[in-house]
Amino acid sequence: MEQKKLAIIATKGSLDWAYPPFILASTAAALGYEVQVFFTFYGLQLLKKKPNLEVTPLGNPGMPMPMGMDKWFPVLGLALPGMQGMMTAMMKQKMKSKGVASIEELRELCQEAEVKMIACQMTVDLFDMPKAEFIDGVEYAGAAAFFEFAGESDICLYI
């Protein structure tokens, strides 16, 4: 029987959007899938050695806020200076208290499971991102290389 394949395109660079690609990739790899994740545009932030990821409550009104913050601050209040940083700190604390793995831990788990992580070369060049900022083991390729794998995949996800 041929090994199943999962292809993921990761385009978001915020803390809340960083979890799905790594959770799904590591789970699929644990289930025996061959997995490739193609990081493009803001998703490249997830491959940085020192990611500075924040939640974006203003851009996601459906996001439940820790400790009932959504009831204290209407959507307009989330636009106040410092609110994004405060919400990020609160979300990180909540995740830690619930035992949720960090992005760095999930990313390392993916590497150990041989998930292939590909940085979009065009976007790396577009944003003048030095390769030294990225974790070891990242491959660099264009969309055409990813499509070769995605075309053979059993599941393709855009996150």
From Swiss-Prot:
Q: Which superkingdom, per the lineage?
A: Bacteria
User: Where in this chain does the entry annotate a coiled-coil region?
Assistant: none
Database matches in PANTHER family: CONSERVED WITHIN P. AEROPHILUM (PTHR34655), PEROXIREDOXIN FAMILY PROTEIN (PTHR34655:SF2)
Q: Which InterPro entries match?
A: DsrE2-like (IPR032836), DsrEFH-like (IPR027396)
The record's section on NCBIfam families has: SulfCarrDsrE2
Listed Pfam families: DrsE_2
Ranked from the top, the taxonomy reads: Bacteria, Pseudomonadati, Pseudomonadota, Gammaproteobacteria, Chromatiales
Its UniProt pathway annotation is:
Energy metabolism; sulfur metabolism
Q: What is its main location?
A: membrane
| One Gene Ontology biological process | sulfur compound metabolic process
- Is Cell membrane among the key words of this record? yes
Gene Ontology cellular component annotations, sorted alphabetically: plasma membrane
Which protein are we looking at? Sulfur carrier protein DsrE2
What do mutants without this gene show? A mutant strain lacking rhd_2599, tusA and dsrE2, although not viable in liquid culture, is clearly sulfur oxidation negative upon growth on solid media containing sulfide, and shows massive accumulation of intercellular sulfur globules.
